[in-house]
Swiss-Prot record:
Disulfide-bonded cysteines: none
Compartments, record wording: Mitochondrion matrix
GO-annotated biological processes: 2-oxoglutarate metabolic process; aspartate metabolic process; biosynthetic process; glutamate metabolic process
Organism field: Arabidopsis thaliana
EC code(s) of this entry: 2.6.1.1
Protein name (database record): Aspartate aminotransferase, mitochondrial
Length: 430
């Protein structure tokens, strides 16, 4: 206001008439963002914020979807440390192409499609490096919106909460399909198949390739085959989000079985891949989006459009994480070490599942905890109610999302007894 008054006075002395609209604009600048309300907290990231603010020495965080060792500490894999050493002193800091590192993409495709995939050899796959799995999902959602504008996406109930945000912001209409059965704490297979059957022909479906987040419930191999056959009959498009390859069984090839089944049955699919979990490269944001096409010509066209979508979004992906992945996967010794380390992480989680279940049973819990060991991957869908989760937080300083999802990576030999006792206390009267 003072600046505006000074300009007005100076203009008046010179016989000039200032443009009132211009100064009205100056007066309103401070109110441009008055209508902006605080965004709701992310249901997952907000858990960690609350955990960090809690001064209690007994606090336990089983909400974060990141691997921790048995001391509750973040882990940098040895294969990653060695790759870092080899890259140290690199003078290459140039932009990557819009499609990212071709070497990293090629190596990544082999993990999903197979080392000897005919689709790779025949150049039928359009693939680009992305900003981890989230970026791959978002890029595909934008691609779907642009090139199948009247389509919608079917998303499982429940799913990773950000899936809904991704397709919503891409302005792709959403529908849901049955997945989890709350009473059996397993797969609601018949309802899932009914939803797939009743969806309009040629619908898009989001599928979790393995280690379903948040339930830890995956279809059996035979169920995947039935799903694939029904998709084929209905001409549906399957988009696989594979964020946890290796974390389900400890074997990345085995965890890609759902994808291989769909490929065997002749589907043209899309895949989101990420190295956040299975290489611990959370902050490096390394991922890949691939779309299997009819022929090489179509693959070239699709890739060019994916790059066109990426250009105004983030232009080109980051370099360092892609270099780490390439260094590990192209070296037989480092790749072998990585596979061993993936199995160690998966086995620790499997072991904690067994210990948690046994601890609850030894406490005399009236409930069945069989689902804790039946579910697989990083998460356990505990069956705890939002009210029980609130009690765990307020009375025992245990933090998790209110849907009862326990990150088994946050469970250690040091806190599993405390966690089991707290769960028993809030559920024993159920």
């Amino acid at each position: 206001m003072a600046l505006a008054m000074m300009i007005r006075n100076a203009a008046s002395k010179r016989g000039m008439t200032p443009i009132s609209g211009h100064f009205g604009g100056l007066r309103s600048m401070s109110s441009w963002w008055k209508s902006v309300e605080p965004a709701p907290k992310d249901p997952i990231l907000g858990v960690t914020e609350a955990f960090l603010a809690d001064p209690s020495p007994e606090k336990v965080n089983v909400g974060v979807g990141a691997y921790r060792d048995d001391n509750g500490k973040p882990v940098v894999l040895e294969c990653v440390r060695e790759a870092e050493k080899r890259l140290a002193g690199s003078t290459f800091m140039e932009y990557l192409p819009m499609g990212g590192s071709a070497k990293m993409v090629d190596l990544t495709l082999k993990l999903a499609y197979g080392d000897n995939s005919e689709f790779i050899k025949d150049k039928r796959i359009a693939a680009v490096q992305t900003l981890s799995g989230t970026g791959a999902c978002r890029l595909f959602a934008d691609f779907q919106k642009r090139f199948s504008p009247g389509s919608q996406i079917y998303i499982p109930v429940p799913t990773w909460s950000n899936h809904h945000n991704i397709w919503k912001d891409a302005q792709v209409p959403q529908k849901t399909y049955h997945y989890y059965h709350p009473e059996t704490k397993g797969l609601d297979f018949s309802a899932l198949m009914d939803d797939v059957k009743n969806a309009p022909e040629g619908s898009f479906f989001l599928l979790h390739a393995c280690a379903h987040n948040p339930t830890g419930v995956d279809p059996t191999e035979e169920q995947w085959r039935e799903i694939s056959q029904l998709f084929k009959a209905k001409k549906h498009f399957a988009f696989f989000d594979m964020a946890y390859q290796g974390f389900a069984s400890g074997d990345p090839a085995r965890d890609a079985k759902s994808i291989r089944i769909f490929l065997e049955d002749g589907h043209h699919i899309g895949i989101s891949q990420s190295y956040a979990k299975n290489m611990g490269l959370y902050g490096q944001r390394v991922g890949c989006l691939s779309v299997l096409c009819e022929d090489p010509k179509q693959a070239v066209a699709v890739k060019s459009q994916l790059q066109q979508l990426a250009r105004p979004m983030y232009s080109n992906p980051p370099l360092h994480g892609a270099q780490l992945v390439s260094t590990i996967l192209e070296d037989p010794e480092l790749k072998s070490l990585w596979l061993k380390e993936v199995k160690v992480m998966a086995d620790r989680i499997i072991g904690m599942r067994t210990t948690l279940r046994e601890s609850l049973e030894k406490l005399g819990s009236p409930l069945s905890w069989e689902h804790v060991t039946k579910q697989i991957g990083m998460f356990c869908y505990s069956g705890l109610t939002p009210e029980q989760v609130d009690r765990l937080t307020s009375e025992y300083h245990i933090y998790m999302t209110r849907n009862g999802r326990i990150s088994m990576a946050g469970v250690t030999t040091g806190n599993v007894g405390y966690l089991a006792n707290a769960i028993h206390e809030v559920t024993k009267s159920s």
